[in-house]
Amino acid sequence: MGSVSREHESIPIQAAQRGAARICAAFGGQGSNNLDVLKGLLELYKRYGPDLDELLDVASNTLSQLASSPAAIDVHEPWGFDLRQWLTTPEVAPSKEILALPPRSFPLNTLLSLALYCATCRELELDPGQFRSLLHSSTGHSQGILAAVAITQAESWPTFYDACRTVLQISFWIGLEAYLFTPSSAASDAMIQDCIEHGEGLLSSMLSVSGLSRSQVERVIEHVNKGLGECNRWVHLALVNSHEKFVLAGPPQSLWAVCLHVRRIRADNDLDQSRILFRNRKPIVDILFLPISAPFHTPYLDGVQDRVIEALSSASLALHSIKIPLYHTGTGSNLQELQPHQLIPTLIRAITVDQLDWPLVCRGLNATHVLDFGPGQTCSLIQELTQGTGVSVIQLTTQSGPKPVGGHLAAVNWEAEFGLRLHANVHGAAKLHNRMTTLLGKPPVMVAGMTPTTVRWDFVAAVAQAGYHVELAGGGYHAERQFEAEIRRLATAIPADHGITCNLLYAKPTTFSWQISVIKDLVRQGVPVEGITIGAGIPSPEVVQECVQSIGLKHISFKPGSFEAIHQVIQIARTHPNFLIGLQWTAGRGGGHHSWEDFHGPILATYAQIRSCPNILLVVGSGFGGGPDTFPYLTGQWAQAFGYPCMPFDGVLLGSRMMVAREAHTSAQAKRLIIDAQGVGDADWHKSFDEPTGGVVTVNSEFGQPIHVLATRGVMLWKELDNRVFSIKDTSKRLEYLRNHRQEIVSRLNADFARPWFAVDGHGQNVELEDMTYLEVLRRLCDLTYVSHQKRWVDPSYRILLLDFVHLLRERFQCAIDNPGEYPLDIIVRVEESLKDKAYRTLYPEDVSLLMHLFSRRDIKPVPFIPRLDERFETWFKKDSLWQSEDVEAVIGQDVQRIFIIQGPMAVQYSISDDESVKDILHNICNHYVEALQADSRETSIGDVHSITQKPLSAFPGLKVTTNRVQGLYKFEKVGAVPEMDVLFEHIVGLSKSWARTCLMSKSVFRDGSRLHNPIRAALQLQRGDTIEVLLTADSEIRKIRLISPTGDGGSTSKVVLEIVSNDGQRVFATLAPNIPLSPEPSVVFCFKVDQKPNEWTLEEDASGRAERIKALYMSLWNLGFPNKASVLGLNSQFTGEELMITTDKIRDFERVLRQTSPLQLQSWNPQGCVPIDYCVVIAWSALTKPLMVSSLKCDLLDLLHSAISFHYAPSVKPLRVGDIVKTSSRILAVSVRPRGTMLTVSADIQRQGQHVVTVKSDFFLGGPVLACETPFELTEEPEMVVHVDSEVRRAILHSRKWLMREDRALDLLGRQLLFRLKSEKLFRPDGQLALLQVTGSVFSYSPDGSTTAFGRVYFESESCTGNVVMDFLHRYGAPRAQLLELQHPGWTGTSTVAVRGPRRSQSYARVSLDHNPIHVCPAFARYAGLSGPIVHGMETSAMMRRIAEWAIGDADRSRFRSWHITLQAPVHPNDPLRVELQHKAMEDGEMVLKVQAFNERTEERVAEADAHVEQETTAYVFCGQGSQRQGMGMDLYVNCPEAKALWARADKHLWEKYGFSILHIVQNNPPALTVHFGSQRGRRIRANYLRMMGQPPIDGRHPPILKGLTRNSTSYTFSYSQGLLMSTQFAQPALALMEMAQFEWLKAQGVVQKGARFAGHSLGEYAALGACASFLSFEDLISLIFYRGLKMQNALPRDANGHTDYGMLAADPSRIGKGFEEASLKCLVHIIQQETGWFVEVVNYNINSQQYVCAGHFRALWMLGKICDDLSCHPQPETVEGQELRAMVWKHVPTVEQVPREDRMERGRATIPLPGIDIPYHSTMLRGEIEPYREYLSERIKVGDVKPCELVGRWIPNVVGQPFSVDKSYVQLVHGITGSPRLHSLLQQMA
């Protein structure tokens, strides 16, 4: 229960005291609240105890006595009616189910209402008489009338208690007797359970039914009662609560029968009925039993009256004490009119027998406020029934505790708020006024977008010129250029105060998308497109948001077709509360496309929700045609016929009615057919779904939606095919039906339809395409696409179709058909002459397919015939069917009965003449409105429109106004509501015409014939802190207006940013002086002229010199300083910037500004070192912007947008650093045509000490319809392309290219790779078509290592090509040298999303970036330029994103960014919340490619997208050595990676051809033996190759063979190894090296190999590293070298019969022995083992200090080393074991180790791991004797000229020294010191 306010500030009470409010007290009755009635009393008692004590005493005593009376005691035993005890001790009260029975709930409900009334009086400190004096009337719902009658007779507190005692007695006896009179229930347990299971509640005597109309409920009752038979079982309609809420009463078992019936007729919850006609839908019904056990308001309680009166013989009510109207619940009559003896019987019957009609009661209340005292849902019912009538319903029974009488004075009265009125205009004439006239400035009648009528711009212009709102139908446009051109034509033809609204179809997503794009650009250019209407669907919230926020429209309308769609529009309006949303309702009776909905029902149900959105403009249409039929919809009176209050619409739209207007392009024959149609009324239109109704019928359109059209002969065929053919959804069954009925359908097409059957032969017989000759096809095409009697094509595209078929003939028969002509007859003659007898051949099958393809082309208007009865028959039949109504001449026989004419079944009755202009039609309607309103007595007083619409300035407390005789100041403080500019401007300029009024109140200005938004008005839009200063003449005329704004530096200073002045009242000068701290202060002057026409004054801008003045402003702002040179510089000039030094202070300032906007996690990020890559725009700013100033570039810099910018470091150069001295030059790369303007691309080159370092490219978009230069051009540096000439065909193709000029034509191309470095230059015609293409550049022979040699050049020039011939060729046969390789799983492992806000102000960035463009820092300037306010510098947004990416990758010295390219896609406004997302998306040439995006968190619009090429963290590539080989290694990559497979294949081929074995076979199978045969010629070559290999040192001057036993006479040689050949050194080494190089190739193919990275190899891995990362040896030579090395090592030592040596290798980890056991200890142990045993062993590899070493030696020594290491690991201090103790440990193991055979494999120890497959002591002194032969072998194969130091210096880390390779003397000394190489010794002597 809510407390009642004590405040006498109660608005309703005050109003009632003044007589300004009429308050009605309403009381509730029985219902679901029965179960909680005692709980309600208890809560009220807890809150108001003392105030209610006297009333509760009266009630408790009265009810207790009555309950103990003889007539009641049987019912009330054993609980009695001890109310006081129940309230003080609730647990002793009966259960809520017992209390809900009528004998108790009835008096308790009455008491609850009276108690709340009593508490209200106490809170207001009024006695009941005083309170009653403020009431206008009273009533009650059902038993609530008892409480109502009690308060009407109360004069004081005593009389109030007396009245309460009396009505409680009446209530007690009614409840008791009703309970006793209730027929006994025959409901079974099954019935009860059934209702519970169906969610209908516990079976009772009253059933709530909602969702049906009253007539539907009565039909349900009639049906059920027929089945019940006897009347004593019937169900009755007891209560009519609202239009769709009812309560039925009767025996529970009978109500169960109602439930059964309702279940059968109602719709399931998930049933979709949207495509079912409203009349045929199942209703959505809710039924619920109420906890009421007596059938109140039914004849079943007819005897209660007498019994109650008998019990009340001592009670009486004095009629004379009822001082206020008391309304009967069934009739609504005033009970004051009754005689005294009639009152009690009337009250009893009103509760027990009489049907309750609550809507009737509420309609007669005549109240402004209703106080609902409950209990129950009375309040919601009253609110529902009185909504829109101005009645405020205040509920006093809510749990939340409102101030019940503190509500507003009155609720909205829809009729008063939205109804049509007459107001006086400035001349005193009567003028229509409502929300549409206020919001759109047009009369409340409009013409809807409708194809084909409003597709025509001239028709739309005629409506606009008549002064009415109209929509251009975008559905009739299929090309962007045509759509744009027609809008521009329309813009020139409409009045200055009229905007353009385009009607778009959301059902065509592609068309919708490009039309939105066109409109967006047109708005940006100032074309007055003010709104769009979206039909055929409601877009997604994201699409709507885009339309609302980014286009610049004033309003968007939607055409919902259902309840759900209406709610979608309401949600859109709530999402965008400050944007005007139109809701156009046409429902199912409209002409053309329509829904399945009833016209009135959905609006009746949603009107209140619609009107809760003040930004919705509600327009109604369909079925209208004149004034009398539309007038009730504008006043709202139409709703009264349905029992609702007035529901006015804001406007009426006409569609079908306008098709017969004089200006409409509808053919005369079609107009006559429309006029002849009779039409029908609202009750019958739905019949058109089944049959012609009033001359109109519904068919299914090409979109599958119902559409109303005239029932012509052709349309009736359409209807028939809808039913017979198109309703068959199974394609195969439909085709079968078409085959079976082909002859009938074809005949009907030819006889009745606008699209005839195409395939007709020369004899007039219907055939198929396959049966026609080429000449017959040609003739038929001409007949059906050309209007011969008017000598024109039906559509120009059909001529293209015909010529394409002629081209097909030319290609088919290889004959010349030159200049076929313009006219069909000429074409036929020329084709026939050229083809001769071939013309009479039947079509080839492939030509039939080609012909069908031609018929289906999207760039051709859909063909006007049916080519086939195939699966596309419905498309052929229905597509593009509306145009014939405007071109009957193009129809066969000009037969209007064949065509498709849109019309509505109701609207058609109003079309009675084809000689009315649009102006006459619309004016006549509006004139009727004026006459009807003038005749209405309520509208005799005509108000002043200005006095009604204009708000006082006092409504805006934040506006401080100071005026005197010479000056007016209007200052917008930093708090308070934003002033409405129209209100403010009206106060400034007054109502009289003047130059100032024209400047401030005109919505548009004219410039060069174009209408644009008024920039002065936009600039003057006040922001917080702004002041408008108005200076007056001595005659109080305005002479000057100034806008004074804060400087934006954070201080308190302000300056004049805009000054408007006129000395003669005709010429106006507007001076913009953006508040930028430069000296001298920059400013620009705009000149205007006030054109004083009789009816209106308009503002026209003088455009002469305008562009030059703006350029001069920007020269000053950007400090370009070359105004005199700009006239002599041209588009091909080179521009230079000043030489400058990059200083620490500049970089620090730049970074400080960026840090201010950084999110919290980046505040401490402060990288040092290189210059931020985007600081390059600051360096290059002067050079980048100077090209914008050249005089030959025609542009308005106010329309300049920074579209994109990129920074690219030159290859291998070091990034810029502080201290660098740089100079920049630039040139224009492109001035290119874009659909909505011109794109200017400028490239700047930053040089450091004469070396090119960075290229900066910037795209500037220049909006507007005028081209920026006479000859647009593009200069493009094409990507480097590589073509591999890998076939004879490709060689021949290259030879044939005339544009490829070779330096040496004799040089064979086959096998070469050619690198192309080209530039393209394109010149364009003004229409954007290519006029000249020139491609030039160099061609190089390209080797895999990246080296190039000159090969030739390219020169191509053409004036007639449609694309870039050269680049197309290279893309077809080649590929870019550096390819972007997308990652399979792009993403980011760290923080990938960062939230950041745009800067609050941009002055700081403007200062550090040198970009003082005022649109970023001056709000007034930004608004003048057409923006909503300042926008953040695009480069600041870029820098913020770059900084986040820099932080994410950890680029602490800013050295890793190699390029940054950002596209700026939407403006960022100050303080916009942004979300930056980072993703690693690709690799390119070893660099990471990051995708960085920024989104506006508020709108989810992407504002910028950047690609960054970033070097990886410093990377080294390390290749492992021998010992890791295993069978099958590398084969996964071989299978899955083409590059790896190619390398394996290349090596396999080489080794097979040169050495006779397959390395793939060895790796895949690891055979124990392999025999190479030398018998064939190839075998002998292989044997010779082996013999040329040097083995041991020469004996007697001759080298022994490397393969022992091999001679010139050997016929074969067998390699064998017991563990498999892959484990033998000679094969393991090439296999391992090959696998590693293949892996590296795979990495290169993924683009992940870092350029310039360091590399090293472990032992054998060094060869793989050099092979993968350097190029001094070819791949094949390297493989041969590694194979030789393996053979050399394999045979360096003696082997036993099994091929084994006595040697091996072992890895040791000293740290596993003990913490103190380190490198020295291990070396000592190894030395002692060799010294004591004589077995060779050495530490040969030093891998990880104190953790990993490799020892080589005799297997026994290695075995012993492993065992001793195990022993030492058990010692508590192994590092202390020295000398003698170690020797003892050695000798301990000698006996055992001497017994170990060579075949035994060493086992893994605690600190040692044997290396399997290695039986050579690599890197040991034992192999020193092999050095010299190996050195000689290498010297023969490695040529000094092939070594490229750049590949090795600083990158290669050799094993021998562990330091990066160098050619410095110090490095040579280091290597010599380690190796003692004699050659290095000699080199050092030379370097001395």
Swiss-Prot record:
What is one GO biological process annotated to this record? fatty acid biosynthetic process
Supply one GO CC term from the record: transferase complex
Database matches in InterPro entries: Ac_transferase_dom_sf, Acyl_transferase_dom, Acyl_Trfase/lysoPLipase, Aldolase_TIM, FAS1-like_DH_region, Fas1/AflB-like, Fas1/AflB-like_central, FAS_meander
Q: From the UniProt record, which GO molecular function terms apply?
A: (3R)-hydroxyacyl-[acyl-carrier-protein] dehydratase activity; [acyl-carrier-protein] S-acetyltransferase activity; [acyl-carrier-protein] S-malonyltransferase activity; enoyl-[acyl-carrier-protein] reductase (NADH) activity; fatty acid synthase activity; fatty acyl-[ACP] hydrolase activity; fatty-acyl-CoA synthase activity
Q: MaoC-like domain: which residues?
A: 1399-1500
User: Which region ranges are annotated with the description Dehydratase (DH) domain?
Assistant: 990-1478
Q: What happens when the gene is disrupted?
A: Abolishes the production of norsolorinic acid and aflatoxin B1.
Keywords (alphabetical) are:
Hydrolase, Lyase, Multifunctional enzyme, NAD, NADP, Oxidoreductase, Phosphoprotein, Transferase
Task: Tell me, using the record's free text, what induces this protein.
Answer: Expression is regulated by the atfB, srrA, AP-1, and msnA transcription regulators. These factors bind respectively to the conserved motifs CRE1 (5'-TGACATAA-3'), SRRA (5'-T/GNT/CAAGCCNNG/AA/GC/ANT/C-3'), AP-1 (5'-TGAGTAC-3') and STRE (5'-CCCCT-3'), present in the promoter of aflB.
According to the UniProt entry, what is the EC number of this protein? 2.3.1.86, 4.2.1.59, 1.3.1.9, 2.3.1.38
Q: Which domain of life is it from?
A: Eukaryota
Spell out the residue ranges making up region: Malonyl/palmitoyl transferase (MT/PT) domain.
Answer: 1517-1877
Give the residue ranges for region: Acetyltransferase (AT) domain: 23-395
Q: In which pathway does it act?
A: Mycotoxin biosynthesis; aflatoxin biosynthesis
Which reaction is this enzyme known to catalyze? acetyl-CoA + n malonyl-CoA + 2n NADPH + 4n H(+) = a long-chain-acyl-CoA + n CoA + n CO2 + 2n NADP(+); holo-[ACP] + acetyl-CoA = acetyl-[ACP] + CoA; holo-[ACP] + malonyl-CoA = malonyl-[ACP] + CoA; a (3R)-hydroxyacyl-[ACP] = a (2E)-enoyl-[ACP] + H2O
Q: What does this protein do?
A: Fatty acid synthase beta subunit; part of the gene cluster that mediates the biosynthesis of aflatoxins, a group of polyketide-derived furanocoumarins, and part of the most toxic and carcinogenic compounds among the known mycotoxins. The four major aflatoxins produced by A.parasiticus are aflatoxin B1 (AFB1), aflatoxin B2 (AFB2), aflatoxin G1 (AFG1) and aflatoxin G2 (AFG2). Within the aflatoxin pathway, the fungal fatty acid synthase aflA/aflB provides the hexanoyl starter unit to the acyl-carrier protein (ACP) domain of the norsolorinic acid synthase to allow the first step of the pathway.
Q: In which family does this protein belong, per the annotation?
A: Belongs to the fungal fatty acid synthetase subunit beta family.
Q: How does it assemble?
A: [Alpha(6)beta(6)] hexamers of two multifunctional subunits (alpha and beta).
Q: Could you tell me what this protein is called?
A: Fatty acid synthase beta subunit aflB
**Organism of origin:** Aspergillus parasiticus (strain ATCC 56775 / NRRL 5862 / SRRC 143 / SU-1)
Its organism's taxonomic lineage begins at:
Eukaryota, Fungi, Dikarya, Ascomycota, Pezizomycotina
Q: Which gene encodes it?
A: aflB
